[in-house]
Amino acid sequence: MLAPLENSQAHVDFLRNIAKTWAESVRSGHLQKYDVIPLIKTTVMKSLEYSMALTTIDEATWRSILSPVLQVCLPKAGVCRNFPRVVVMAPLSLQGLGIPNPFASQISAHLDMLLRHPAARTEAARYLENNLQSHQLETGTSFGLLQQDYSNTAILASNTWLKRIWRELESVDMYVAFDSPGLTLPREGDALLVEVFMDAEVDQETLKWLNWCRLYLQVSSVADISTADGKYIRQAAWEGQREQLWRQSY
């Protein structure tokens, strides 16, 4: 689940094949109008929803996956096949057809993963916590991964499942707060290096290179690379040499 890489295109092709195969089987069958939409909800949608906790497919791709189903089933339900999708996927209470929006269902599955497992203290919760703390060290900021601005610090994070969830939630203006330990500052007046770089308004490419240097040195704050009086950067940091710090987050 938390592996840095995923074969997303293969998964999209697999889901699209499920939808096309199901649509072809329905095309040749005889159905009553009032049976079509309940059939979609209870059969093909369940197959598509099965892996949604792990997929991070964007909304446009989900619409293309579901398109063969709607192209076949809407006419059978007495509805124009090109009926606006916003109405097709709207709930019955808002005079829609009530067909689940797969992108919304995917977000719901992700929120369930993020909220249910930590509350139940499952094994998956441990992996989530470890991954969040790894990202905390990687981005070097005082906020948890899901509370950061994606456009500012996404370039600093590895491409994991959590990063893709972060991007997805920000696209719909949602965030999830986790009670996870953050990076601590050992001195008064100290500051995290990444936040110093961001306050200096360096560009994204420079920020990425500075962060790589910070990760190589295994430091997080100004105090980690400065002299005891805080006035100068130690020679080892200039020369790219790691030092054994009295406190170590890595």
Residue ranges and their predicted role:
Residues 65, 80-250:
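Extended C-terminal regions of large enzymes
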